[in-house]
């Protein structure tokens, strides 16, 4: 389904409350290596997604021009917030022994919250644009990748805003237990091929993504679907590649830094324990599928 789309109200909350009161009265914020299992705790208080630096409250009316105007108005702010958050959040992971952090919390309301970040390196690729194009290919075809790699039934509805500038889409995913989850997402991509002083001054690419809170035209269906919200950021940077004997010259290394906050809302309909567990287990699966898709696409072109 492809229709034109635009947007209407946005409020940005730029501060993040980091004081988490756990059952033991302790704060949480530990990172794990790639091989370590993610932590999951019961919390009595969790910094709401509304206070996350990557989150902007976005409400959509039925008017296409208003929808578009609001998204375009917040685009640059979203890109800047994404870039600066990644620089601050992923700095502690910039070492071989610590490239991944995944913290999960179950709220008193029964929601599952996940705060995570990771660093991936695509070594010996042709260019920054090659990896950026692979990221955008995944974004434009994610329902195919999710269906193939997760074995779920995925459907994506596209509400075009501005090609290569702003994208709005809804993804509906049904797992093997017959439980359906939905996400309504807006994405702001940009490739700074020549660099920009506001984004580090060196060539880079930024992708800021956020959830839609309310949509008068395409409302959530909480009595039938589990709502999945995500406020995430991706930054790509490029560096010189050291070739091995079998490689030619002119290749580069592209580093992807990702961070975000995700929430699975408590289902408002009957659901089996197995079905709910599968939904919870898949909270970060989309990110893993993205990396697999990008690697496959980039290295098949070498």
Predicted regions and their residues:
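Eukaryotic low-complexity, proline/serine/threonine-rich intrinsically disordered regions
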Residues: 2-12
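Intrinsically disordered, low-complexity regulatory segments of nuclear proteins
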Residues: 5-7, 39-43
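Eukaryotic helix-grip
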Residues: 13-15, 19-24, 31, 46-302
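Long, leucine- and charge-enriched amphipathic alpha-helices
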Residues: 25, 29, 35-38
């Amino acid at each position: 389904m492809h229709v034109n789309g635009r947007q209407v109200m946005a409020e940005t909350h730029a501060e993040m409350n980091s004081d988490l009161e756990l059952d033991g009265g302790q704060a949480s914020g530990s990172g794990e290596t790639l091989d370590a299992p993610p932590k999951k705790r019961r919390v009595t208080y969790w910094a709401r997604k509304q206070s996350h630096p990557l989150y902007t409250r976005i409400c959509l009316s039925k008017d296409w021009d208003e929808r578009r105007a609001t998204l375009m108005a917040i685009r640059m702010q979203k890109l800047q917030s994404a870039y600066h958050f990644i620089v601050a959040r992923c700095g502690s992971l910039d070492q071989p022994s610590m490239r991944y952090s995944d913290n999960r919390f179950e709220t008193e309301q029964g929601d599952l919250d996940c705060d995570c970040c990771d660093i991936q390196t695509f070594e010996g690729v042709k260019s920054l644009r090659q990896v950026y194009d692979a990221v955008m290919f995944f974004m434009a075809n994610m329902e195919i990748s999710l269906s193939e790699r997760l074995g779920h039934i995925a459907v994506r509805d596209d509400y075009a805003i501005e090609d290569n500038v702003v994208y709005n889409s809804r993804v509906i995913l049904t797992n093997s237990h017959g439980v359906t989850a939905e996400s309504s997402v807006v994405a702001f991509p940009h490739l700074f091929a020549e660099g920009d002083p506001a984004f580090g001054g060196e060539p880079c690419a930024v992708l800021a993504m956020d959830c839609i809170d309310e949509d008068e035209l395409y409302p959530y269906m909480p009595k039938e679907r589990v709502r999945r919200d995500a406020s995430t950021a991706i930054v790509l940077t490029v560096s010189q590649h050291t070739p091995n004997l079998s490689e030619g010259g002119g290749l580069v290394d592209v580093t992807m830094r990702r961070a975000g906050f995700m929430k699975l809302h408590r289902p408002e309909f009957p659901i089996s324990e197995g079905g709910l567990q599968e939904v919870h287990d898949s909270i970060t699966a989309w990110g893993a599928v993205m990396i697999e898709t990008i690697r496959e696409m980039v290295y098949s072109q070498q």
